[in-house]
Amino acid sequence: MGNKYFHKILLDGNLCLANKRGYVYMSNELKTPFRYDYVGSFLRPQALKDAKAQLRKNEISKEDYDKIVDEEVAKLVAKQKELGYHVITDGEFRRAFWHLDFMWGFEGVEHENTGGGIQFHGELALLDDTYLVGKLKAKPHPFVEYFKFLKQFEDENTVAKYTIPAPAQTFQQFIIPDNLESTRKFYETNEELIHDIANAYREVIKQFYDAGCRNLQFDDCTWGAVVGDAAKLRYKALGIDLDTVKSQLLEVNNLALEGKPEDLVITSHICRGNYNSTYFSSGAYDSVADYVFARENVNALLLEYDERSGSFEALAKVSPDKKVVLGLITTKSPKLEDKEAVIARIKEASKYVPLERLCLSPQCGFASCEIGNKLTEEEQWAKLRLVKEIAEEVWG
């Protein structure tokens, strides 16, 4: 793009061309998602695991621990750039859980480690109990400060992306059976809760925007949790209408997106759970496509598409204003996919969404929680090399 008449500059997180007189021309070159992309979380390096263990034993101070985290994030970003990726993240290194830590940053939310969790396929995912102790409101969010640290590493070839749980994920957290009694002390109806969650998210989104964030990703397991026969049986046993649930998930997400700045890209990653290489649910997207694919007001969808995800036919419901990132490379196993088989799947998906609106990524993050998935760091990088290699062959 650059030549003797123009030079590249980074303005508010967007790559631009500027001439010698200072006139600026906007470019979409650094608008996520990219042809080869990734979800966001990475395996915690051993130095970080050791530091966390020392912190828990009071062998190092919180200040010393934070310095180590900063160093490891800087190393991760350097690796992301070395691999040729245009998006940088902090790997979620500052979190214990991909979703709960963000919720703890709202007023009215408390958490406690009671040794409980959520049953995944063959394994209990140990999670902190997270519940309401008052009305949910926004306050200066610590994740915004984490983003500011990441943003300093942006350059003319990269843009910082930050991942947070979707509003629907926060809504779902406070209406699960174990939390409903405490939630009803502050919210008589789900609609009241939806209203406050959407307001809080809009405020936090503004905080991110004011800090220079132009690429924000909602991570959303709620849609994956309401697909398949098991979900139908689960909600029927609870006496809850599944279509009402889907409508409320869509409502809270779209309310939170109202009024977002035009130059802020917000995407949504949808999967079915990711903990120590296990999963929470299985099922095709068909039963939620009319909601999230057709009517959720995000710029792009990063969709898990492994063997538990059904066919590509549901992609026909994706609205024409959205891009789709196909999550065809698993992060749950170190085995590398066959390149030609992945290319064939991309070709199959292009029957429903034009190739120019498709991208490629791993199906989920590499470490949605501190424990991480069952592969090594080098196997993690090999997955990303494969994604890039395939994308360059398909799209040039």
Show which residues each predicted segment covers.
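Domain-level signal for soluble alpha/beta catalytic cores
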Residues: G22-G396
